[in-house]
Structures are given as structure tokens and as C-alpha cells.
């Protein structure tokens, strides 16, 4: 079966590098699904889960906090602002971050503080959604 080279990197480290049959991720205009031979594309990505289906059918999940996606016919590169392997996501920390961001929204004094709190809330909410999605796919409740 045809595969595509996938690299997911953040400013800190390379998170994933390998061959895949399929990649799904949250693009700026909606969910994107990428197969080998996909039309070249460059777009921004939103915070959320990147799902990588490997050659042997196993799935790898990576949470990204936004970034840039580059697609070439034989390669997919995700340049993430921040990336966390699915197995390393911490639901308790994400929930605390969501609560802090909601509190900050209530207590903002300037437009900049409000925008920062909104971005933090979107990040925490996307991380919690990725955790729930991963748990559902693994059959955990």
C-alpha cells in the first residue's frame, strides 16, 4: 500500500517521523484528511489532534497548539507551535488551564489581556477535546 512520509516537529523537538497511510488534522478551514499523492498545500492549523495511521494500521496521536502544515505528494510536514504526544497529555493539567483561562476572561482589564485569555481558553479546550477523542478511540470512558 502507498505511504507518505510524515514529520511532526515543534520548536522544542521532533515528535514524530515515519511512514503513514493517512493523516488527519484540524486545518484552518476545517478537518483535513491527507493520503499519499495529495495535492500540494500549505495552510495554518488550529489547536487539536493530529491522527497518523501508520503502515501497519496503528494510530499515533499528537496534540498541536496550532502551526503550519505543508503537504507535498510524498511528504507531510507539521510545524507546530507546541506539540505533545497523545500518551503524554495530562487531563488534570488541561482542566486547570481551562479554569484559569475562564477566570482570566472574567477579570481582564485590556483588550490584549482578553485576547490572551481567549487564546489560552481555546488551547485548553482543544487539548481537553483531544484527550476525550483519544480516550473514546481507545475504548476508555
From Swiss-Prot:
Q: Which organism is it from?
A: Paraburkholderia phymatum (strain DSM 17167 / CIP 108236 / LMG 21445 / STM815)
GO CC, any one term: plasma membrane
Identify the coding gene. atpC
What name appears for this protein in its UniProt entry?
ATP synthase epsilon chain
> Which CDD domains does the entry mention?
F1-ATPase_delta
Q: What does the subunit comment say?
A: F-type ATPases have 2 components, CF(1) - the catalytic core - and CF(0) - the membrane proton channel. CF(1) has five subunits: alpha(3), beta(3), gamma(1), delta(1), epsilon(1). CF(0) has three main subunits: a, b and c.
UniProt keyword DNA damage, yes or no: no
| Family listed | Belongs to the ATPase epsilon chain family.
Q: Which HAMAP family match?
A: ATP_synth_epsil_bac
Record's bilayer topology term: Peripheral membrane protein
What is the protein's known function?
Produces ATP from ADP in the presence of a proton gradient across the membrane.
Q: Do you know which SUPFAM superfamilies this protein is assigned to?
A: Epsilon subunit of F1F0-ATP synthase C-terminal domain, Epsilon subunit of F1F0-ATP synthase N-terminal domain
The terms under GO molecular function for this entry are: ATP binding; proton-transporting ATP synthase activity, rotational mechanism
Its subcellular locations are: Cell inner membrane
Q: Which keywords describe this protein according to UniProt?
A: ATP synthesis, Cell inner membrane, Cell membrane, CF(1), Hydrogen ion transport, Ion transport, Membrane, Transport
- NCBIfam families (alphabetical): ATP_synt_epsi, PRK00571.1-4
Amino acid at each position: 500500500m502507498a505511504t507518505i512520509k510524515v514529520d511532526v516537529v515543534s520548536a522544542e523537538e521532533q515528535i514524530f517521523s515515519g511512514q503513514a497511510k493517512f493523516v488527519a488534522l484540524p486545518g484552518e478551514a476545517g478537518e483535513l484528511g491527507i493520503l499519499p499523492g495529495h495535492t500540494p498545500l500549505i495552510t495554518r492549523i488550529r489547536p487539536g489532534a493530529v491522527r497518523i495511521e501508520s503502515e501497519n494500521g496503528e494510530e499515533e496521536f499528537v496534540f498541536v497548539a496550532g502551526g503550519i502544515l505543508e503537504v507535498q505528494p510524498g511528504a507531510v510536514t507539521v510545524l507546530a507551535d507546541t506539540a505533545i504526544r497523545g500518551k503524554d497529555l495530562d487531563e488534570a493539567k488541561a482542566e486547570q488551564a481551562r479554569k484559569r483561562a475562564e477566570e482570566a476572561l472574567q477579570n481582564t482589564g485590556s483588550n490584549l489581556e482578553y485576547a490572551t485569555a481567549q487564546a489560552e481558553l481555546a488551547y485548553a479546550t482543544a487539548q481537553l477535546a483531544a484527550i476525550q477523542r483519544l480516550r473514546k478511540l481507545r475504548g476508555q470512558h
